[in-house]
Amino acid sequence: MMDFSSVKRIVIKVGTSTLAHNTGNLNIRRVSKLIEVMSDLKNSGKDVIFVTSGAQGVGAAKAGLHSKPKEMPKKQACAAIGQCELMHIYDREFANYNHTVAQVLLTRDVISNKTRKENVINTVSYTHLTLPTNRE
């Protein structure tokens, strides 16, 4: 097992296959356990950045669809629905450990634009008292 005792910042990336059951519905037990582990890392003094995708799949399930849509407008609608659902659950679960979450939306255009990229870096740096949650 690797020794992470000297590591200051830990980035944890999860996607739909980790967050959801095969039905597309959230695996609440798994999400809760993941947040418990991240909160413990945060409590031990680590900076934790949680990068999560899966909004589209979660949104499709919440909208009653049996699969992710193919058309862009439906994809966008499902992502919007799913993002609200994910952030609601993350906020609720992290609150159990007295941690505040912040959302930073990461897209290719944000990373490729110098000013936007600096804004993201500043936000993540400033939120040293929170556990930032990012979506790719």
Residue ranges and their predicted role:
Residues M1, L86-A95, N119-Y126:
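Short, charged beta->alpha transition segments
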Residues A61-Q83:
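A charged helix-plus-loop insertion that forms the helical arch/lid used to bind
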Residues M1-I49:
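N-terminal glycine-/serine-/threonine-rich phosphate-binding loop
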Residues V48, D91-V104, L129:
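Short, flexible active-site-proximal loops enriched in glycine and acidic residues
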Residues K74-C78, L106-T115:
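Flexible, glycine/proline-enriched loop segments at strand-loop-helix junctions
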Residues T127-E136:
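Conserved small/polar residues in nucleotide/adenosyl-binding loops
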Residues V11-K13, D47-G59, V101-Q103:
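Short beta-strand segments at enzyme active-site cores
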Residues T18-A20, A55-G59, I111-S112:
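Short, active-site-adjacent cap segments at secondary-structure transitions
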